[in-house]
Design a protein with these regions (language model features):
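Extended catalytic cores of very large enzyme megasubunits
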Residues: 1-144
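A short, hydrophobic C-terminal helix/tail in secreted or cell-surface proteins
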Residues: 145-149
């Protein structure tokens, strides 16, 4: 089944309706959170579509456990950001088949032991690059790095 592709203007207008005329919210949602493929094709027309994507994916995982919430129950919690407000990376990443995204926003990284060698510093840099390319933020725990005097 081929997914519907929306133009920027279609997604913006529908998001503007959803956000009751808030132009900034509508533009930010389309630019940052609407599902897009690597060619920039937009696959969600409004935050309602996003909430259904998130609800369906969480319900899929929840179904493996007792007392699971249905997709509709989860959608009702997400709708208009009333009870559950996912942060940026989860809003983009949950149920998104078009890109690899982190489901967490921020990570603390570091190495075991002293981090005062070139190798340890490069390892931390590599971890930061991998996290940032997946839209995660990184905090380096570098208190073990010795200053040069």
């Amino acid at each position: 089944m081929e997914k519907q592709i929306y133009s920027y203007d279609e997604a913006y207008e529908e998001s503007l309706r959803y956000f009751q005329g808030d132009e900034l919210a509508a533009r930010v949602w389309v630019n940052k959170y609407a599902v897009k493929d690597s060619f920039g094709n937009i696959y969600e027309k409004s935050p309602e579509d996003m909430h259904w994507r998130i609800a369906n994916e969480v319900a899929r995982v929840e179904s493996k456990y007792p007392n699971a919430l249905t997709a509709k129950e989860l959608y009702d919690l997400l709708d208009h950001f009333k009870y559950i407000v996912p942060q940026g990376s989860p809003m983009t990443g949950i149920g998104n088949d078009y890109q690899v995204a982190s489901l967490s926003n921020c990570f603390v990284i570091g190495v075991d032991g002293a981090a005062d060698s070139y190798g340890a510093i490069i390892k931390i840099d590599e971890e930061q690059v991998q996290l940032m390319k997946r839209r995660g933020g990184a905090v380096s725990y570098t208190h073990l790095t010795l200053p040069t005097i």
